[in-house]
UniProtKB/Swiss-Prot annotation:
The protein, known as: Endonuclease NucS
Family: Belongs to the NucS endonuclease family.
Any matching Pfam family: NucS_N
GO cellular component: a single term: cytoplasm
Gene Ontology MF: a single term: DNA binding
Chief localization: cytoplasm
Organism: Mycobacterium sp. (strain JLS)
PANTHER family according to UniProt: ENDONUCLEASE NUCS
EC number of this enzyme: 3.1.-.-
HAMAP family registered for this protein in UniProt: NucS
Length: 223
């Protein structure tokens, strides 16, 4: 991973356009090819980013060089580097990834087997659908064929909603999947998390773990 602290301006050019005026920012260039731009006031969420596969090149600008990050669809993240204050590279090795606790892993398995709990006509596309920022628990399609990303938690809190929001922002950049809606599924969801999810257009679903454990893999068991 390469970490660069620089005075820079940033322009996103693609289906949408966005401009960040000159400021000191952290630029992260990861080994998977992704590039993200961070400020000091947004926790872990980048100001803008480009997901892999993409290519980073440098153009000679006047008066400053321009880093051009381009993805396979031709969208560009153009970073005009006015001054570099820090530039270092680090080999972090292979990360083992986030390991879900036993209950969350079992909830994911059960919901994948009984995807109809999400709604009539839902079908499973894939469990652990990989993205540049981690795996989405379930990627499904609703009764109309539209993509739905499902994040599963034992306890639904604000950080889980934020995590799903990041997945949705990324998935909706994929023209083969967009539009992608979200479902936040948990055994219990805190009021603040539900409010945030509703505000972002994410549907909340309460999972009854005991009932789901009483289901066979191919039919409901009544008890």
């Amino acid at each position: 991973m390469r970490l660069v602290i620089a005075q820079c301006t940033v322009d996103y050019v693609g289906r949408l356009t966005a401009h960040l005026p000159s400021a000191r920012r952290l630029l992260l260039i990861k080994s998977d090819g992704s590039v993200s731009v961070h400020a000091d006031d947004r926790a872990y969420k980048p100001l803008n980013w480009m997901s892999p596969p993409c290519r980073l090149s440098e153009e000679s600008g006047d008066p400053h060089p321009v880093w051009v990050v381009e993805n396979k669809t031709g969208e560009q993240l153009r970073i005009t580097v006015e001054e570099i204050e820090h530039d270092s590279s680090h080999d972090l090795g292979v990360d083992p990834g986030l390991v879900k606790d036993g209950v969350e892993a079992h909830l994911q398995k059960l919901l994948a087997e009984h995807v109809e709990l999400l709604g009539a006509g839902y079908t499973l596309v894939r469990r652990e659908y990989m993205t540049a920022i981690g795996p989405v628990d379930l990627l499904c399609r609703d009764e109309t064929g539209r993509s739905v990303a499902v994040e599963i938690k034992r306890r639904g809190e604000i950080d889980g909603v934020e995590q799903l929001t990041r997945y949705l922002e990324l998935l909706n950049r994929d023209t083969l999947l967009a539009p992608v809606s979200g479902v936040f599924a948990a055994q219990q969801i805190k009021p603040q998390a539900r409010t945030l999810a509703n505000d972002r257009g994410i549907r909340c679903l309460i999972l009854d773990y005991d009932q789901m454990r009483g289901m066979d893999s191919d039919e409901y068991r009544l008890f």
